[in-house]
């Protein structure tokens, strides 16, 4: 029996959520680096939104709530822009302060987590768009 891609996406989103939230806790408690913690937490929240998107797709809730998918797409775009701005800002500040790449409190790790947030916001936008397109086609067919 073939394994459905959606279930792989659910597992991947669960893993991303756990890693993002653990990064939030580690960089807040152990390293006292709030910027890296914030971007790790944002990555975890975006992975959680992607997980919710997949679960609602599996449970067929999106068919009746296409505006919700439009909202998720808008949030994905907004957080993509925010992540790009954060990545560039952290990179510029880390270079200007001549921080070490191996230091766990440097802003280079904030750049990494900004990129991870960008990845999850892009995936949130992509999956919301795909699911919306699929259900929009089905709703057009149901009108006849």
Curated annotation (Swiss-Prot):
Its main location: membrane. It catalyses: heme b(in) = heme b(out). Pfam families: HRG. Expressed throughout the embryo, including the central nervous system. The chain crosses the membrane at residues 10-30, 38-58, 71-91, 107-127. Changing residue 34 to L: Unable to rescue the hematological defects in mutant embryos. PANTHER family: HEME TRANSPORTER HRG1. Heme transporter that regulates intracellular heme availability through the endosomal or lysosomal compartment. In macrophages, is the heme transporter for heme-iron recycling. Essential for macrophage iron homeostasis, transports heme from the phagolysosome to the cytoplasm during erythrophagocytosis (EP). This is Heme transporter hrg1-A. It comes from Danio rerio.
């Amino acid at each position: 029996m073939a394994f459905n891609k959606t279930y792989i996406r659910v597992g991947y989103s669960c893993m991303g959520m756990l890693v993002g939230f653990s990064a939030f806790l580690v960089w807040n408690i152990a390293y006292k680096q709030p910027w890296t913690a914030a971007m790790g937490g944002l990555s975890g929240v975006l992975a959680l939104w992607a997980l919710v998107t997949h679960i609602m797709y599996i449970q067929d809730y999106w068919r009746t709530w296409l505006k919700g998918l439009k909202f998720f797409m808008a949030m994905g775009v907004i957080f993509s822009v925010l992540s790009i701005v954060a990545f560039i800002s952290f990179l510029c500040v880390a270079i200007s302060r001549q921080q070490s790449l191996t230091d766990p409190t440097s802003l280079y790790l904030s750049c990494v987590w900004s990129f991870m947030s960008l990845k999850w916001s892009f995936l949130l936008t992509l999956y919301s768009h795909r699911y919306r397109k699929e259900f929009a086609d089905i709703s057009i067919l149901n009108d006849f």
